[in-house]
């Protein structure tokens, strides 16, 4: 039986940790644990229901974890469900009951180490990289048990679209990138070309009907090349010599967004070596299955710039095509032969040194799933028996998540710190602190243990790294990459907890460690006042002209975002209430510049574009909250007035808000189909309007929204999983499974205390 293991791994000599694996979440199949008939029936029903409704509800509800926790942490008291009719008033008592039902449930799915585990899947192109890398290295059967493979196949079949293809993400239309990689994954997992009740054949037909695998995106071309199912000559150049350029040049990889450079780093190593894995019978068969013409007849030079129209979110500018053609025809031949080959060898050596630095300083987790499996493959290419390769293997499990739709690869090793920091703020907002003190105490302990306590070793400039001492990461301290808004949300949560007696929530964080966190936040402000994600913006937006990833937008540099900027303002204002003299002038100046930046980037309709959540409701929540924290109000700030008008204009007939992920792609507000409301969008809009003083002007929109949230709550106190709510790089959606509980709790908590009780 499958079981979610939390904070385990101390007995494994190939696992490294800074804090005893706190926050680690791994699904493990234990054949000795059969499970009760009731549990097995619940699991099977959940799987069957998902498959039956997979084209209507494409998002899983994370039920396997919930079934496990319902047995381990049964809810002591399930209060009667509350409903509010259209003709009825929303009363404080009904809101309080709804909150207690929600908090009773949400506390029951908290892990023993204090965080809330959950699904952080969504993208369909992540797991194929893992499967291809394991297949090449010969480790597939050692790392993936038959049960792992079965669940991965379940996931791939469940998320195949009606037309036979697969999307970039679970809710997206079919793309060549998703379809080819998912098809290849099924074949490498042992599925025959005509298995899956015709599903594999339907996938192949979609690929061939849309031009074959030569039309896959550049990332897909790279994966097929290392597998041996595509030729390196059909790739645009990924020269590792970029790492030898002087840093003063704007195009140096060290100036790029860390996710971008950390993906192209191992790609450039593999390209520089022209590495190809073992040509197995399956690979030879794929050469026949994936193309519309015989493999030996393919024009690989022409294939370099081919891309299916379904995948083309960011078409290559002409300048880029000229650049790649020049490198391909004139520069690459020189670097592949002596004496130019000596420069190539030096570049490859530089690349692998940076790969090892990244591996060692993330305990072999790596910044994300794409570079995780690429780095692992590079370590194997360098030396199949290396310690580095062996240290990579057990960390693969950190990225795998199991739900009723099957096993997927997550977009990070989880969202542990991020979700926990938000959860604390949500619970505190309800003013039911004593009742849920044990929950807050565990979360408090977890947040303190997730802080990064040291900078990375060596010369940070040489390794292109920012300071990290005092920061909070998105997931775990073992991952360790510092992020501006994660650090800010960590500070905010701790400042709230510091106001509560320690007998209830435990001892607060040492002041010096808070000072370190504030130092990280201050260090991440750009000259224009905005805050990027991991590092300062190190180059220019025109670098996007050389963005080779047709599928993603705005990936080349670390841009400033409304979310990061707002979170920084909120953190610094909450901090200075308790420590008014610490770096007073720097903090004051930082907040003023940040507020000006936020006003400057507001869209003319009053909204802010959200880059990490769907989309304008998310961005506008941060916009309003940041400006209010900076001392602005509806009365003295036209930006807040315009933002409120924008949100009120988008309220649905049901009383809630419901925004489609299409907003992210099109950069125009798009309602969910049928003008449906969504509990998460509704909560974001409510929180925005409450902060902007809507209750004093006209509380009716808030009452309508609260009614929708109360009526949406499920019988057990949980809230429903609706459409996907996370996004990255403009075009790819990602799951935040905890949002469905955190934000309705937070919105109803604020509504109860600041609207109903205040009136």
From Swiss-Prot:
Which family does the record assign? Belongs to the terpene cyclase/mutase family.
Q: Which reactions appear under catalytic activity for this entry?
A: (S)-2,3-epoxysqualene = cycloartenol
What Gene3D superfamilies does the annotation carry?
1.50.10.20
One GO CC term on file = lipid droplet
Alphabetized SUPFAM superfamilies for the sequence: Terpenoid cyclases/Protein prenyltransferases
Name of protein: Cycloartenol synthase
Tissue expression notes: Ubiquitous.
Catalytic residues as annotated in Swiss-Prot or TrEMBL: 485
> From its record, what is one biological process in GO terms?
tetracyclic triterpenoid biosynthetic process
In terms of domain of life, where is this protein from? Eukaryota
A GO molecular function term, named singly, is: cycloartenol synthase activity
What Pfam families does UniProt report for this protein, alphabetically?
A: SQHop_cyclase_C (PF13243), SQHop_cyclase_N (PF13249)
- Which CDD domains does this chain map to? SQCY_1 (cd02892)
The EC number on file is 5.4.99.8
Per UniProt, which keywords does this protein have? Isomerase, Repeat
The stretches annotated as PFTB repeats are: 149-190, 514-559, 591-631, 640-681, 702-743
Q: Which InterPro entries match?
A: SQ_cyclase_C, SQ_cyclase_N, Squalene_cyclase, Terpene_synthase_CS, Terpenoid_cyclase/PrenylTrfase
């Amino acid at each position: 039986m499958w079981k979610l293991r939390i904070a385990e791994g101390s007995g494994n000599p190939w696992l490294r940790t800074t804090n005893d694996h706190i926050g680690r979440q791994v699904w493990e199949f234990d054949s000795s644990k059969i499970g009760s008939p009731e549990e097995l029936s619940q699991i099977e029903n959940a799987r069957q229901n998902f498959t039956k409704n997979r084209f209507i509800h494409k998002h899983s509800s994370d039920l396997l974890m919930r079934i496990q926790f319902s047995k381990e942490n049964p809810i002591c008291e399930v209060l009667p469900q509350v409903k509010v009719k259209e003709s009825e008033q929303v009363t404080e008592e009904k809101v309080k009951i709804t909150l207690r039902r929600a908090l009773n449930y949400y506390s029951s799915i908290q892990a023993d180490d204090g965080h809330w585990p959950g699904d952080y899947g969504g993208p369909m192109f992540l797991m194929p990289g893992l499967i291809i890398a394991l297949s090449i290295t010969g480790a597939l059967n050692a790392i993936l048990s038959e049960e792992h493979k079965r669940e991965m196949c379940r996931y791939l079949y469940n998320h195949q679209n009606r037309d036979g293809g697969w999307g970039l993400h679970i809710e997206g239309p079919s793309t060549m990138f998703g379809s080819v990689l998912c098809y290849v994954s099924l074949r490498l997992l042992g599925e025959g070309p005509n298995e899956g009740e015709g599903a594999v054949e339907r996938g192949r037909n979609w690929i061939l009907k849309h031009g074959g695998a030569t039309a896959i995106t550049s990332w897909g071309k790279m994966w097929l090349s290392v597998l041996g199912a595509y030729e390196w000559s059909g790739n645009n150049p990924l020269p590792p010599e970029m790492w030898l350029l002087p840093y003063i040049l704007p195009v140096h990889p060290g100036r790029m967004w860390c996710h971008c450079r950390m993906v192209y780093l191992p790609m450039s190593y593999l390209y520089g070596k022209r590495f190809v894995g073992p040509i197995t019978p399956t690979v030879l068969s794929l050469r026949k299955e994936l193309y519309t013409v015989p493999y030996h007849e393919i024009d690989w030079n022409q294939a370099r710039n081919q891309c299916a129209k379904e995948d083309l979110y960011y078409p290559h500018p002409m300048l880029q095509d000229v650049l790649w053609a020049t490198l391909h025809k004139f520069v690459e031949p020189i670097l592949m032969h002596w004496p130019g080959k000596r420069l190539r060898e030096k570049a490859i050596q530089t690349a692998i040194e940076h790969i090892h630095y990244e591996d060692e300083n993330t305990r072999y987790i790596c910044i994300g799933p794409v570079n995780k499996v690429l780095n692992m493959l590079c370590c194997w290419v360098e030396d199949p028996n290396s310690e580095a390769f062996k240290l990579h293997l057990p960390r693969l499990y950190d990225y795998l998540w199991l739900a009723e739709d099957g096993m997927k690869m997550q977009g990070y090793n989880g969202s542990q710190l991020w979700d926990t920091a938000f959860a604390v703020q949500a619970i505190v907002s309800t003013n039911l602190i004593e009742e849920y003190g044990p929950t807050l105490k565990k979360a408090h302990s977890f947040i303190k243990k997730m802080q990064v306590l040291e900078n990375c070793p060596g010369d940070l400039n040489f390794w292109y790294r920012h300071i990290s001492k005092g920061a909070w990461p998105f997931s775990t301290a073992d991952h360790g990459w510092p992020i501006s808004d994660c650090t800010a949300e960590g500070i905010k949560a701790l400042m709230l907890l510091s106001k509560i007696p320690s007998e209830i929530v435990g001892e607060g964080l040492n002041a010096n460690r808070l000072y370190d966190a504030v130092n990280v936040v201050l260090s991440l402000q750009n000259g224009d006042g905005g805050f990027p994600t991991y590092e300062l913006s190190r180059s220019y937006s025109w670098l996007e002209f050389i963005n080779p990833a047709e599928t993603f937008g705005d990936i080349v540099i670390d841009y400033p975002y409304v979310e990061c900027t707002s979170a920084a303002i909120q953190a610094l204002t909450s901090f200075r209430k308790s420590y008014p003299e610490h770096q007073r002038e720097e903090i004051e100046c930082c907040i003023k510049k940040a507020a000006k930046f936020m006003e400057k980037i507001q869209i003319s309709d009053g909204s802010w574009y959200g880059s990490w959540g769907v989309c304008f409701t998310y961005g506008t929540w941060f916009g309003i909250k940041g400006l209010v924290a900076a001392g602005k109000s509806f009365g003295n700030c036209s930006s807040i007035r315009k933002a409120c008008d924008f949100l009120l204009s988008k309220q649905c007939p049901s009383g809630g808000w419901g925004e489609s992920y299409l907003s992210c792609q099109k950069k125009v507000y798009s309602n969910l189909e049928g003008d449906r409301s969504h509990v998460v969008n509704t909560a974001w809009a409510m929180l925005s309007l409450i902060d902007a003083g809507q209750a004093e002007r006209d509380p009716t929109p808030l009452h309508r929204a609260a009614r929708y949230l109360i009526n949406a709550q499920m019988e057990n106190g949980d809230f429903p999983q609706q459409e996907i709510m996370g996004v990255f790089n403009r075009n790819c959606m990602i799951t935040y499974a905890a949002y469905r509980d955190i934000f309705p709790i937070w919105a109803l908590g604020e509504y109860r205390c600041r609207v109903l009780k205040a009136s």
